[in-house]
């Protein structure tokens, strides 16, 4: 089974719980389509403090490490969030297959 990094908003507009639920739905979508989803943005903030600059940097590093190990990189929703943009750039540099989906899991062009 291929692995896929799920990139979706998490901290945007302080809607963490709503965004977490969306990320779980995106993970289910990936799983139902034959992929093993990786979404560290959902659990790393429970281990490290997102609001401390040094630990937020560690979260970003762990996310990049996860991207490096995944076969593909899927983006859901609006990537305007700064963290998502940086991760997309990193995935591009890693040569990952990148797919963009809207918030309803419809493939975008």
Regions found by a protein language model. Name each.
Residues 1-109:
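Catalytic phosphate/metal-binding cores of nucleic-acid and nucleotide-processing enzymes, i.e., regions
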């Amino acid at each position: 089974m291929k692995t896929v990094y799920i990139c979706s908003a998490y901290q945007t507009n302080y809607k963490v719980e709503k965004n977490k639920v969306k990320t779980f739905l995106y993970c289910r979508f990936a799983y139902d389509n034959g992929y093993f989803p990786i979404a560290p943005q959902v659990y790393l903030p429970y281990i490290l403090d997102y609001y401390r600059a040094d630990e937020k940097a560690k979260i970003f590093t762990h996310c990049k490490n996860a991207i490096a190990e995944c076969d593909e990189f899927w983006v859901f929703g609006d990537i305007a969030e700064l963290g998502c943009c940086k991760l997309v750039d990193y995935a591009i540099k890693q040569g990952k297959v990148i797919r963009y989906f809207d918030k309803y899991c419809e493939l975008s062009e």
